[in-house]
Amino acid sequence: MHVRRAAARWHNGSVSVFQSFRDIFTLRDDPSDRALDMPSRLEAPHGFARISLRPVREDDQEDWNDVRWANRDWLMPWESGDPLGGRPLSFNEWVRRMRQDEQAGVGAVFLIEYQMQIVGQVSLGAISYGAMRTGMVGYWVSQRYAGHGFAPLAVAMLADWAFRDPSGPHLHRIEIAILPENHRSKRVAAKLGLTDEGLRRSYMYVNGEWRDHESYSLLAGDVPGSVTDRLVPRG
């Protein structure tokens, strides 16, 4: 009798696990239903630095290139890449790829603007649905504006959009992977109250080599209100 009960528990548990994987990898609905309704602009809440987030456009190429070139040494230690050395996308190809990702509901990239100038970028990628509903967050801010609180505010705004905004993907969890020596980025995670989930070995190819990353997560259930409420307004 005890053997039968144990077998039944194992069977039910296995079905649950296998069902979860089927939910993840099987499209049970029309993929077009997952298309992200990208907002034209997300504004910082009143009382915070007056940054805004907006999707990248093809006519941003010159300004985006200028900011990236001016910050090339500042950003290089943290740049991820393709270990197989694939051909880099042109700017317009990159924008078209973003539009495809938005339509598929698997990614969204926003420019960070301050006083009508591009000062950085924040993105939500590798979005999974089904039993997981999770996504990876990435960001960078121009060295000129480091220390102004733009990065944590931009990540908080993105998280609020991803968790609860009607136009967002309604995720359960977001994750940030951070190089152990990237103390500025770890302060962003700390300011937002993300949970340190430990080290992931050789997790991402960065600046020419596979690197360990520390994983930080935030759940929609961790935040009863707005993620930006976790920050102190800076005006």
Predicted regions and their residues:
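Acyl-donor (CoA/ACP) binding surface of acyl/acetyltransferases
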Residues: 2-63, 67-74, 109-235
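Generic, well-ordered alpha-helical segments
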Residues: 56, 67, 83-90, 104
